[in-house]
Design a protein with these regions (language model features):
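N-terminal small/glycine-rich loop or linker at the start of catalytic domains
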Residues: 1-6, 67-80
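Histidine-acidic metal/acid-base catalytic patches
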Residues: 1-5, 13-29, 106, 151-274
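A short beta-strand-loop structural module common to alpha/beta enzyme folds
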Residues: 29-41
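Short acidic, glycine/proline-enriched helix-loop-strand junctions
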Residues: 41-64, 139-141
C-alpha cells in the first residue's frame, strides 16, 4: 500500500472534465467528484455521453475517479426522512443513481454524509445507509460515511452497520462543528475503519457550522501537523484528499487558485512522503 493524493471537485471554482484536467496538471492522483447537480438536474452523471467524457478525460490526464460524494443528501436533508415519504424516496433515488454512476465511472467509493439532529432523523439516516450498503455490496462499491457527529454516535452507527461502511475522516469537521477532537477520532477509528481523509485547515474564528473558508494546509489553527503525525502513527496508507476551498477567502484574496492548489499539493506530498 502507498499514499495517494487527491482533490475534491468542489474545492475548485470549476467542475466536471475541466476540474479533472486541472487536477491532472497539478499532479494529483485522483479526484472526489460531486454529483454534477444530482437529483435537481435529473442525475446527469448517469447519462452515457457525460460518462464517456468523464472517463476519457480521467484517462487522458491519468486521474483516478476515486469517489463520488452525494452531497445533496445532506444539503437537501432528504436522508433524515423516512422511506415512503417524498423526501425519503428522493434520498433512495439519489443513492440508487449514485451507485449506478459509480459503476459506469469505475468509482469504488460512495461518500454519504450524515449529521442528524434528532433521534428520528438518526434512525432514518441509518435505514438509508443500510439500503445503500445492500446496493453497494451487489455493485462492489465501498460506502464511506462522513459525519460531524460526536465520536460515540458515529461508533454506534458503525456498530449498527456491522462493518459494512468505512469512514471518510475529515480532519477539520470535529473542530468546525464543535463535536470532538480529530486526533481522538482518528485513533479510535484506526486504519481498518478509515476509507480516506479529507485534508483541510482553517482559522479558529471560522470554527463554526456553515463556514467554508479555509487556509493553506499547516498555516491555520486546526493542528494539521499534529493530525498528520497521528495518521502516520496509526499506520494509515491510502488516499489523502484536500477539501480546502481554493477560491474563497480568507485563503484566496484575489489570488491565483491554481497556485494555492499547487502549494497544498506540495505540502501534502512533503508531509506524507518524508
Amino acid at each position: 500500500m502507498k499514499n495517494y493524493y487527491g482533490i475534491c471537485e468542489w474545492s475548485m471554482p470549476v467542475s466536471g472534465p475541466l476540474a479533472i484536467r486541472l487536477a491532472g496538471t497539478a499532479g494529483f492522483d485522483g479526484m472526489q467528484l460531486g454529483e454534477a447537480g444530482g437529483r435537481s438536474l435529473n442525475f446527469p452523471l448517469n447519462h452515457p455521453e457525460i460518462q464517456q467524457i468523464y472517463n476519457e478525460t480521467a484517462r487522458h490526464y491519468e486521474i483516478r475517479l476515486h469517489s463520488l460524494n452525494l452531497g445533496a443528501l445532506l444539503a437537501e436533508g432528504t436522508i433524515d426522512f423516512p422511506v415512503n415519504t417524498p423526501q425519503g424516496d428522493a434520498a433512495r433515488a439519489s443513492i440508487r443513481n449514485g451507485i449506478r454512476a459509480c459503476r459506469a465511472l469505475d468509482i469504488r467509493t460512495l461518500v454519504i454524509t450524515v449529521s442528524p439532529k434528532t433521534e428520528d432523523a438518526y434512525s432514518n439516516a441509518l435505514s438509508h445507509l443500510e439500503y445503500a450498503c445492500r446496493l453497494a455490496e451487489i455493485s462492489q462499491v465501498e460506502i464511506a460515511v462522513e459525519s460531524a457527529l460526536p465520536l460515540p454516535l458515529i461508533q454506534v452507527l458503525l456498530d449498527r452497520l456491522k462493518g459494512r461502511v468505512k469512514v471518510c475522516m475529515d480532519i477539520l469537521n470535529p473542530l468546525r462543528f464543535g463535536t470532538g477532537d480529530p486526533i481522538e477520532q482518528i485513533q479510535a477509528f484506526g486504519t481498518e475503519t478509515i476509507s480516506h481523509f479529507h485534508m483541510k485547515d482553517s482559522l479558529r474564528s471560522l470554527f463554526t457550522p456553515g463556514q467554508r473558508g479555509c487556509v493553506l494546509l499547516g498555516t491555520g489553527d486546526a493542528g494539521y501537523i499534529q493530525t498528520a503525525e497521528t495518521i502516520k502513527k496509526i499506520g494509515f496508507q491510502g488516499w489523502m484528499i484536500t477539501e480546502n476551498y481554493y477560491y474563497l477567502p480568507p485563503m484566496n484574496m484575489n489570488d491565483d487558485f491554481m497556485k494555492l492548489i499547487l502549494k497544498d499539493f506540495e505540502t501534502l506530498t512533503s508531509t506524507f512522503e518524508s
